């Protein structure tokens, strides 16, 4: 994947200014980050500009629209140092509105999925072939399964097996037995589906899933919808007890 790399560590709490200065100085070739970093740049620096009436009008003209998007793409790339070949996002779900915009300007990003117990990467795909809303395909030497009768259409827990998967928690056989089954598969606790091309999409966490009268409700999908509404800074969906529906 990479070799002969130089890793730069920030010596202070990574405020937006400190991060921006570091990118400008280091000019990284590869960036691995959480969604919050790219979302802040797009939402605070880009969206306010392109949502102005005159910009919306200009972006309805094909030739001008292409030039505007290319200009925005370059400015966002420059904000990350200007040299990187790919920006890999992980650790949480990428905001759908931001992702759609990144795709529209052909920004070189991709989304990966993993966990500490797995070394940590389980899925990844090059940004040029990455499928929107997914988190890529299983990486080499890793076997992934969706614990579902129909992995393409019915959500199930993501199970992982491979040389990068831990053998167990240190001196804690009870905790190990709870997550690694008899076949050697690690139960991630994450829910997802897999399309016909092997791309995985995370839908939520088992512990977060709300069961209402037998119906499975995934908070993340509702949160994504509410998050786009004006005036909402943050949102969290939680189930409440119900005698009629159970939760």
Label every PLM stretch briefly:
Residues 10, 89-90, 146-148, 155, ...:
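Thr-Gly-centered strand-to-loop micro-motif
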Residues 107, 137-140, 150-179, 215-217:
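Conserved ATP/PPi-binding loop(s) of AMP-dependent carboxylate-activating enzymes
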